[in-house]
Regions:
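Class I S-adenosyl-L-methionine
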Residues: 1-15, 19-175
Length: 175
C-alpha cells in the first residue's frame, strides 16, 4: 500500500526553532519535539501518543508513536493509546474528518483527552499550527477558548469549513 501524498506544509523545509514558544512563558505542549529536543529545556515530561493496534506488526512507513514535550507543572510522562492507523480509528467518527487531509493531523478524540488532562473549561488554548483544525474542534467539545493560526491559506480554508460544518456557525473575517 502506498502512503497518501499531502500538500507540502509551508516552511516545513526550514529548521524549526521553538524559542518563540518558550519565550511566551506559558504552559506548552509541543508535538514532534523529539525532532528538535536539543533546542528545548530538559524535561521529564513527555506525552506519548501510541496509535497502532495492539499486536500489529510494525509498518516502516509510519511511526507507532508521536511524542510531545511539555513543561506543565505537576504532570509527568503520560501515554495516550488512541488507535489511528489507516482505516482503523478509535473514537467518535462524527468529530473526525472522513479522511486525513494533513500529514500531521491528530484525532479530535485524542486532543479531547489531552485537553481534559492538562487544562480546564474556559481556559485559553493557543495552537500556532492549525493544520486540519482538530484542536479547534476539541476546544469546541470541551468548552475551551481556542486561538489558532495557520500560515497556509489552503489549510485555513479546511479549518474554516470544518468548524462551520461542526458548529453550524458561519466564520466571520475580521480585518
Amino acid at each position: 500500500m502506498q502512503a497518501k501524498r499531502y500538500k507540502p506544509i509551508l516552511n516545513d523545509d526550514k529548521p524549526y526553532d521553538p524559542t518563540i514558544l518558550l519565550e511566551l512563558n506559558v504552559n506548552s505542549i509541543i508535538w514532534g519535539a523529539n525532532n528538535f529536543a536539543s533546542k528545548l529545556p530538559d524535561s521529564p515530561k513527555w506525552l506519548v501518543w501510541y496509535k497502532k493496534p495492539m499486536g500489529k506488526a510494525n509498518d516502516d512507513n509510519f511511526s507507532d508513536v508521536e511524542l510531545a514535550w511539555t513543561n506543565i507543572k505537576g504532570k509527568m510522562c503520560k501515554m495516550y493509546p488512541y488507535l489511528w492507523s489507516g482505516l482503523l480509528r478509535e473514537g467518535n467518527r462524527d468529530l473526525e474528518l472522513k479522511e486525513r487531509v494533513h500529514p500531521t493531523q491528530k484525532p479530535v478524540g485524542l486532543l479531547i483527552n489531552i485537553l481534559n488532562d492538562y487544562s480546564n473549561p474556559n481556559d485559553n488554548i493557543l495552537d500556532l499550527y492549525g493544520g486540519s483544525g482538530s484542536t479547534l474542534i476539541a476546544c469546541e467539545e470541551t468548552n475551551r477558548n481556542c486561538y489558532m493560526m495557520e500560515l497556509d491559506p489552503y489549510y485555513c480554508q479546511i479549518i474554516i469549513n470544518r468548524w462551520e460544518t461542526f458548529t453550524g456557525g458561519k466564520a466571520v473575517k475580521i480585518n
